[in-house]
């Protein structure tokens, strides 16, 4: 008979906030609070604003335009990240780029994971197909197996919250989780450069 020693534990998601104004073209920093012993899966939560026809009303009323044609880039959650890095005690330990995250996921993601991942990062027709200010039919693959919403006339992009999974070494396996309790004399920070 073999007895193995184990410890009960719980996993909880704890939201952390960035210092400074998180906006396009900015660098923000988050100091990880010591609410637990380990840091494991880490996600970036981004809220994309609504883009509607009222944003182009000044140009339209001045006779300079005919409405707002807008769309987010494909894979907006990955595209919004210029780079993200983990810093421990003032020393950069790991750095990743949004482009690298995109390539990595294209190479390693299974077809079963793809649909959920695309929804998390905003790669949906709701965000990536162009809006039509005249409410006319959106030019798209209406006769194919595309989702029905592609062909529905839209004049705005909705406000959407994205959840981008970060791929640091401690996010991949519970055995590699970052031991915050052992780093009590060092600050753990996540630095994010937004495109």
Please give the residue ranges for each predicted region.
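Short, low-complexity Pro/Thr/Gly
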Residues: 1-195
């Amino acid at each position: 008979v073999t007895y193995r020693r184990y410890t009960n534990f719980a996993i909880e998601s704890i939201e952390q906030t960035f210092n400074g104004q998180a906006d396009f073209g900015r660098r923000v920093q988050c100091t990880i609070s010591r609410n637990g012993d380990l840091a494991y899966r880490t996600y970036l939560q981004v809220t994309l604003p609504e883009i509607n026809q009222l944003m182009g009303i000044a140009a339209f009323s001045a006779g300079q335009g005919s409405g707002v044609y807008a769309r987010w880039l494909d894979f907006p959650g990955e595209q919004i990240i210029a780079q993200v890095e983990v810093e421990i005690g003032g020393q950069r330990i790991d750095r990743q780029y949004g482009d690298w995250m995109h390539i990595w996921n294209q190479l390693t993601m299974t077809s079963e994971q793809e649909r959920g991942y695309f929804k998390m990062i905003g790669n949906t027709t709701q965000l990536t197909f162009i809006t039509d200010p005249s409410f006319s039919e959106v030019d798209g693959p209406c006769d194919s197996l595309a989702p029905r919403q592609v062909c529905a006339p839209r004049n705005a992009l909705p406000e959407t919250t994205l959840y981008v999974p970060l791929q640091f070494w401690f996010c991949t396996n519970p055995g590699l989780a970052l031991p915050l309790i052992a780093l009590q004399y060092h600050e753990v920070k996540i630095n994010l450069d937004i495109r």
